Amino acid sequence: MEEEQDASIPALEPFRVEQAPPVIYYIPDFISKEEEEYLLRQVFNAPKPKWTQLSGRKLQNWGGLPHPRGMVPERLPPWLQRCVDKVSDLSLFGGLPANHVLVNQYLPGEGIMPRPPPQPITSLLLEPCSLLVLRGAAYTRHLHGIAAARVDELDPASPPPNAAACCSALPGARLVRGTRVSLTIRRVPRVLRAGLLLSK
């Protein structure tokens, strides 16, 4: 209970997803369609070497170079910094700004799941332009993933717990997937100066 209280963000409580592990917030229309289109243009205009092909997705890494001793920080591009500032303004990181972004692209039929895939305890519907916030046990104790599918079928008897916030979550709906682009915005607490990384 104490962990849940520490993870709660009072200003986001209207967006809390009930009947789900604590604490999950789902904010529909967090960005506008115009902002979405702008971000997508910038993502797909990124230099080809910026993309890394992984199993079931493609990835861009912005904000720093991962290293066992810490992250070597890099300045975020202005087009991405605006979105990062908007998330940081929610006070998700103890008043500190986010400093790292992973951009993931999933084609229809692609996904990423833990191996072996566990029995899911909940499943959410994430619509375009929305923001999903995982805190507390939902972030520290549970794995999360995206099922590799081309169509998502909503069970009328068991709708996703955030269905009330999703205009496409009609009972029995068949939702055909398009290309999915997601931004994982986070704060990496341990960063290094380049000189420290190179020192003995």
Predicted regions and their residues:
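Non-heme Fe(II) oxygenase metal-center motifs and adjacent flexible, charged/small-residue loops
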Residues: 1-200
